[in-house]
Regions:
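Outer-membrane beta-barrel "beta-signal"
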Residues: 146, 165-177
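Repeated loop/turn-to-beta-strand initiation elements of outer-membrane beta-barrel proteins
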Residues: 27, 50-56, 83-88, 118-125, ...
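Cleavable N-terminal export/targeting peptides
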Residues: 1-24
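Residue-level signature of outer-membrane beta-barrel architecture
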Residues: 46-48, 79-83, 114-118, 144-146, ...
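Residues that define the transmembrane beta-barrel architecture of outer-membrane proteins
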Residues: 25, 36-40, 69-75, 82-84, ...
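Transmembrane beta-strands of outer-membrane beta-barrel pores
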Residues: 31-35, 58-64, 83-85, 92-98, ...
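Short glycine/proline- and aromatic-enriched beta-strand/turn motifs that initiate or cap beta-hairpins
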Residues: 18-64, 176
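A charged, solvent-exposed segment within the mature domains of Sec-exported extracytoplasmic proteins
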Residues: 110-159
Length: 177
């Protein structure tokens, strides 16, 4: 996971002088896979005022076992600010897991990263801390999208939830407004 992120970071820095503001007005609908299970993913983000944005992200996962499937839902809701290609966001998170019984945990997270693009290609790379279950987890998020037109595109992303949920790959359709 280290090397693709370094390549993405170098691509950001090499095109920083031509980078445009990241387009935060979008909705991603797709599937996720963490190597053990699969599920649906849903993200919606929107500019609010000036360079501020709000974002909600939900990742559902179901892992098959020999007895009963393990179902989990990870979500976070953030408010952020972008200046040039640098962005910061903070908010709350929720982690629900069900096997024979259900547990839910809530916490907070803060992330810092780079976001931008030019033309039809947009990319984002961020890292931060997730406080959940009385522990701190490293969270890394990288995604890229390609727009076919002003309203429709495709998105590909990786979210690394450390030991909490592993590396989750996401592939989906991006709707923009």
């Amino acid at each position: 996971m280290k090397y693709p992120m370094v390549i993405l970071l170098l691509a950001f820095l090499s095109s920083a002088t031509q980078a445009e503001q990241y387009r935060w007005d979008y909705m991603d609908i797709g599937v996720s896979n963490d190597g053990l299970g699969k599920g649906m993913t849903f993200t919606v983000a929107s500019h609010t005022v000036s360079n501020f944005f709000a974002r909600a992200n939900l990742m559902r996962n179901q892992q098959k076992t020999t007895t009963k499937p393990i179902s989990s839902l990870y979500s976070f809701y953030t408010i952020g600010y972008q200046y040039w290609i640098i962005y910061a966001e903070a908010g709350v998170s929720q982690y629900d897991i069900c096997w024979y019984a259900c547990m839910d945990y809530s916490g907070d997270l803060a992330m810092l990263g780079l976001a931008g693009g030019s033309g039809k290609l947009q990319a984002k790379l961020g890292t931060g801390r997730l406080n959940l279950m009385e522990q701190q987890w490293l969270i890394v998020e990288a995604d890229a999208s390609y727009s076919f037109n002003d309203n429709l595109g495709i998105s590909l992303g990786i979210t690394d939830l450390d030991e909490l949920g592993g590396k989750v790959t996401k592939l989906g359709i991006r709707l923009c407004w």
